[in-house]
Amino acid sequence: FGLGGVGGLGVGGLGVGGLGAVPGAVGLGGVSPAAAAKAAKFGAAGLGGVLGAGRPFPIGGGAGGLGVGGKPPKPFGGALGALGFPGGACLGKSCGRKRK
């Protein structure tokens, strides 16, 4: 499951379609444009692809931890965490703040 999700994200590379389709399709679908813009702005898209391809182990673990306990109210935050849990967490926080 973790590898599959990471594969989708890594292959997607953009962290837009893949991100919304795999980890938090329900929650991310609503904020797909915002999350996509933020991801592209911060370069998380490219980083996500590289990290997804190179580090499947921490991504899978990070995705589960962030998605479940890290940011329950912000699904896209968890999804970005899956892309690159260290930067993803910050991204999720920033996104949440800006959106609010």
From Swiss-Prot:
This is Elastin. GO terms for cellular component: extracellular region. Keywords: Disulfide bond, Extracellular matrix, Hydroxylation, Repeat, Secreted. Elastin is formed through the cross-linking of its soluble precursor tropoelastin. Cross-linking is initiated through the action of lysyl oxidase on exposed lysines to form allysine. Subsequent spontaneous condensation reactions with other allysine or unmodified lysine residues result in various bi-, tri-, and tetrafunctional cross-links. The most abundant cross-links in mature elastin fibers are lysinonorleucine, allysine aldol, desmosine, and isodesmosine. Hydroxylation on proline residues within the sequence motif, GXPG, is most likely to be 4-hydroxy as this fits the requirement for 4-hydroxylation in vertebrates. The polymeric elastin chains are cross-linked together into an extensible 3D network. Forms a ternary complex with BGN and MFAP2. Interacts with MFAP2 via divalent cations (calcium > magnesium > manganese) in a dose-dependent and saturating manner. Interacts with FBLN5 and FBN1. Forms a ternary complex with FBN1 and FBLN2 or FBLN5. Interacts with MFAP4 in a Ca (2+)-dependent manner; this interaction promotes ELN self-assembly. Interacts with EFEMP2 with moderate affinity. The modification 4-hydroxyproline is found at P72, P86. Major structural protein of tissues such as aorta and nuchal ligament, which must expand rapidly and recover completely. Molecular determinant of the late arterial morphogenesis, stabilizing arterial structure by regulating proliferation and organization of vascular smooth muscle. It comes from Ovis aries (Sheep). It is found in: Secreted, Extracellular space, Extracellular matrix. Disulfide bonds join C90-C95. Belongs to the elastin family. It comes from the Eukaryota.
